[in-house]
Amino acid sequence: QVHLQESGPGAVRPSETLSLTCAVSGDSIRDDYRWTWIRQTPGQGLEYIGYIYGGASKTNYNPSLKSRVTISKDTSKNHFSLRLTSVTATDTAIYFCARYGSLLRRDHYFDSWGQGVLVTVSS
């Protein structure tokens, strides 16, 4: 069974950089999946942030966030990370990591989620 666990600061000041990590157990992040970050802002639906592909270093980002986002992975620690620069109050959200279906099999669903971490942007 795959388990994902987010970690990072609960609060960030405006204009600073948010860094979050998702630890993966029960699977290797080298595997053929898209390791994904998603967020839910207060009172809103889920917003896709981006993913990194386990089979290589291919990334894909939400165009509206692309200029501020970097997703990377550390195979030695079996985790992947999110970096979001120049944060503002609108980046306050619950941030989730998730495993999206196999790219080679063209699976289009999420099969594992972290519990989420609330990040507040405030001075």
Feature roles, as predicted:
Residues 1-123:
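Extracellular domains of the immunoglobulin superfamily
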